[in-house]
Structures are given as structure tokens and as C-alpha cells.
Amino acid sequence: SQTDSEVAAWILDLFYSQVKDPKAAIKMLVDRIQGSYGFCILFDDRPGEVYSIRSVSPLVAAYTRSGALIASDLTALIPYTRKYFVVPEGHIVKLTGYKISLYDLEGDKVSPEMMEVNWDMDAAMKHGFPHFMLKEIHEQPEALKNTILPRMTKGLPDFTDDQIPDELFTEFNQVHMVACGTAMHAGMVARAFMEPLLRIPVTVSIASEFRYQEPLIDKKTLVIIISQSGETIDTLAALRLAKSYGSKTLAIVNVKGSTIARESDYVLYTHAGPEIAVASTKAYSVQLAALYLIGCRMALVRGKFNRNQAASFLMELLDAIPAMEAMIEHKDEEKNLVTHLIQQHDTFFIGRGLDYAFSLEGALKLKEISYIHSEAYAAGELKHGTIALITQDVPVIAIATQEHVFSKMISNVKEVKARGAFVILLTKAHAVVDDGLADIHIRIPDLDDRFTVFPIAVILQLIAYYASIGKNLDVDQPRNLAKSVTVE
């Protein structure tokens, strides 16, 4: 066989033929194999029984009026129940009709730890939207409020209810963020504003790289783990590695009771509700909001902000919410501009500083749901090679919201325009730009430079969405991709 799971089934069949006891055979199997897996097992001579076991890969189970259910993702259970339990590693689940039994590997029965999800099936419906992605784009302002407002007391960030003590933010001398994909891009944005604010090293690592390295972290390192599902396998492995070095870990996750949430020293739950579309939108925004809250609290307790400065920072963060709403309301601009985009094979995103961090996520969104080859570059690097790829009508999406490098960005835009690029320029409302510099110019409400990511994110998400629609593709389920990457 060329399939590892098929080999596991053959081994289990061999052991079961010897002992004729499902739990004993499963124990023999897991003693023999290594790696990550989540098995649901049927035995020919035991109709009406399902056995399950997992290692690293997630499994959740529930009792419902429809029967006993088990799945790899909580969303699958929500139409039937809000109460569930996470199958612990090294435990066997037996489902029979309406009954679920949980056993350890010695065969002793144990009681599962029941949990309750704080959203229901209504939150996982389209409600008149043609796609989940568009619905989730529209839900971002409310998701931000749900993440930020409960963590504000007298205008200041407060993690008392999250049981995150201020001591966590004073005992380290560096921050290391670890994540994959969109969550990693949220970390890139956070690094860009945290490092100059805190005046300590802030590093962002791709989890699939971090887990196989010997990272320079120790007991004086705060490792922030970012994952929407809380089950991303590379991120989970990175968390375990960080803990083995003695680092304190703080997880930012959206799913209560997920493996990463349970294994981290501290956890800050985002309150985005279910995100069904594979391409992340509102999860990205609330991860950013959580990171801005953390950065503000860090600055306050480390003496980089006084109370007035921290309160002002949070008010500016809240100002980003109506800015997002304005971009959602005027989404026809993005709908109209993709006509040119979808006729091209390549698209380039450029920016400087925070804008470069934004452009990374914009490029990912476009490629994952429209299948247009798209790359993001720091604008200052164009002349070091990438500008050779700029030819007539090649789309370049230039993000220019950072005041201190605005003139430099405009110079970069002129460079690509001179080589025939089709330029889509994103700036603040007050930006002064020469007529004819851009083929399309989209302005966002004026915000502090640190918070322009929120309306910019909406624009980039809508560009990707309408490009996918324009190419008649499956927006919510793009090819070859899964919502939660739980396998290596």
C-alpha cells in the first residue's frame, strides 16, 4: 500500500484476529505506530459499534437526540448539539446508538470533560449571502467588537477574565510569535507595531519551520501561538517545542477547548464565531485585534505607555471598526476593478513597513481562491530583481498608508507605472496623489498608521472574493485546501 492509514487498518485487522477484543486490538495498534492520526473504526462482527482513537489530530464527540456523533471538527456537530467533549489523546471512544463510552488504554472507563460551544447553527448559516466568505467579511466589525469590548475596563485593556496576569508581560525580554498562513501574517503585522513600541526583539516564525529548528528561546521568552482552529498540527508541534524550552506560551485561538488552547499556559479566545469559508477573513481581523490588545497591555505594564496613552491607543483601535464598515458598504469598487485582474496571470502586491505585512495577506487571499499567481514584495526590493517581471498591464496593488514612507511608496508606484503596470493604489483619504498615477485609486478613512490594516484587509478580501466570482470558482471551498490543516 502507498497509504499509511491503509497499513494501519491491516495491522489492526491482524491484531484483532488474535485477541478478538476491539479495545485490546486498538491498544496493540497504537503501541506499534507513530505519528498523527484520528481513526474511526468499524468491526465486521460488531455491527452498531464505532471505535475511535487519536494522536495529535483532533476528534470531538457528542451525545445528541440524533445519536452519538464523532467528528474531526466541531462545526460538524453544531447542527445537532452545543455540548461536546474533546477526545483525549491515548483514550478509546466507543459509540453505540445513543451512547458514548470513554476508556483509557488500560481499558478502564473514564468520564469525559463536557464543554459547551458559545455559538449555534444559526451562526453557521449564510443568511441570504451567496457565499460564507462574503458573509464573514460582513461580520468582521461585530467580531471585532466582541473581541475588544469585553476586554476593556475604564478604557484600558484588561485580561482579568482571561486569567492572564500582568506578570506574564513583565517577565520576558523577547516575544516570539509562531503560526501558519493567515495567522502568521497577523503575527507579521503585530511584530511591525510591537517591536518599536516595546523596544525588545519581536520575532515571527512559520510554525512548520520553527518546529524543526533549535530556536533561540528560553524562560525569558514569551511565545505567542496563533491558530484559528487551535488544531493546526505544525503550530501545535511548535507550541510543544516552545514549552520544552521553558518558555511561557500564550495562545490566540477561536475554538474553545481546542488542543492548542488546552496545552498553552494561557489562552486568549477570539470571539469570531464559526468561520466556514476556507479563506480566512474575520479570524484574521480578530487575531489582529487580540494582538493589538496584548501589545497595548504589554506597553502599559512595562512602562512604555501611561494610562492616557493606552486609552488613546484603544480608542484608535475602535475607530478602525467604522472604517471597516465603510469599506464593506462601498464594496462595488472592488467588484468593478477585478475585470482587469482576472484576465492576467500574475499580480504583485507592494508596500513598506506595516503595508508590506498587509500585502502578504492580500497576495495569499488572491492566490488561494482565484488561483491567480500573486506575490507580495517590500516595495524597496523591487529594484533588486522583481521589477524585471513588471511588463505591460501586469496588475500591481500598491498599499501606501504609512505616512513616514509615503513619498518612497509613491516613487515605487511611479517605477512600476513607467514599465506599463496596471496600478491599483490604496491610500488614506487625505493622501495627495498626482492624477494618472494609478489606474484605480481606493481611499480608506483617515486612521493612525498602526490601524489601517483593518479597512485595508476588507479591501484585499473583497478583491480576492470578486476575482474568484469573476472566474466562476468555488469561493468557499478552493481546490486542494482545507479549513484546518491537521495533517503533516
Language-model features: where?
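Glycine-rich phosphate-binding loops that contact phosphosugars or nucleotide phosphates
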Residues: 170-319, 399-445, 463, 471
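Conserved short alpha-helical segments that host acidic/polar catalytic motifs at enzyme active sites
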Residues: 1-126, 130-131, 142-173, 212, ...
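Active-site phosphate/pyrophosphate-binding segments
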Residues: 31, 140-144, 148-176, 266-395, ...
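Short, glycine-/Ser/Thr-/acidic-enriched flexible segments
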Residues: 44-48, 57-59, 65-68, 74-76, ...
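Conserved phosphate/anionic-ligand binding catalytic regions in large, soluble enzymes, centered on
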Residues: 47, 52-61, 129-133, 144, ...
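Extended hydrophobic-aromatic, low-complexity segments
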Residues: 186-187, 203-204, 233-236, 336-337, ...
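Generic C-terminus detector
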Residues: 107, 422, 435-437, 447-488
